Amino acid sequence: VICVLMCCGENTSLAKGGKLRLTRPSGGRTVSAVIDMTEIQPSAAAGFRVERRTPPERLDVLSREILQLKDDLNAVILAHNYQVPEIQDLADYVGDSLGLSRQAAETDADVIVFCGVHFMAETAKILSPKKTVLLPDRDAGCSLEESCPPDKLRELQATNPNFYTIAYVNCSAEVKALSDVICTSGNARKIVEAAPADRDLLFVPDENLGAWVIEQTGRPMTLWQGNCYVHVEWTHESITRIRREHPDAPLVAHPECTKAVRMLADEVCSTEKMINFCRDSRAKAVIIATEVGMLHRLQKECPEKQFIPAPTEKCACNECRFMKMNTLEKLHDCMANRRPEVTLDDAL
């Protein structure tokens, strides 16, 4: 048994240095194998509003200064779907991590400002090695990325030379370099279906996404035991309650959710595919089980619909503290100072 750091689960606590320590029970999984390891609009009609972090009196001034800095730097501003509304509204592109990185690579910008978390900025650097990549907060990490240290992955790979490693894009550049192929939540099923039939599949780092892909494909895989700490907060009970309150509203869940939540969903899909589902749905209201920042994007894309954040047992919505570390003030300062800059070793 390979023991690695497990940074996600049902119970969370804040440790020294702002790092998250999360634990969860080890039983009840239905996957082939588990390693035991120690992407300014009115809000929805219901009155729910995605929280803004910048005071209104500062918003206009900061926005003008950021746009001027963008011109001065010949920069492109990218915002992940989970960013605060004022950053989404100011960005050139809003979307999922890989889609944004691809979009930035196609521009003539000299500087990419990625409002997201660290592995996303790394992905942008991989696809645009000659561009400067800035991240508003250097400490904006990810529980999934932290759950899969490269040295522990090497140890596991050494136990089976026949492993074919499929890495979810939510991982470090070092883990990507150790993998045979990279996938997103939107194409994971196709990637697994196309994997060599004579290889033993190892899926890292999200066990819930991996388990969902196993359900879709029937292909056995060894799953790294990592989770997004946000998406495992929803429970069967909390989702059942909100569905009873809104019986006519379909539930859309991200595949990073646990099986107990996925089994209650009308659609399980990536953030970008959520937009298409909501556009096509005849329902007037939709329950969304992903990070709450996505509701701002959905409300702008489908202003005629009501979007209901799926509640957890602890709160009425669910935020990623790492995503919310980025603010308009930090965006301004990182552009003014041209740091923090994300760099990668040339050999990597």
Feature names for model-found ranges:
Residues 3, 7-8:
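Cysteine-centered motifs
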Residues 13, 17-31:
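Short, Lys/Arg-enriched N-terminal segments with co-localized hydrophobic residues
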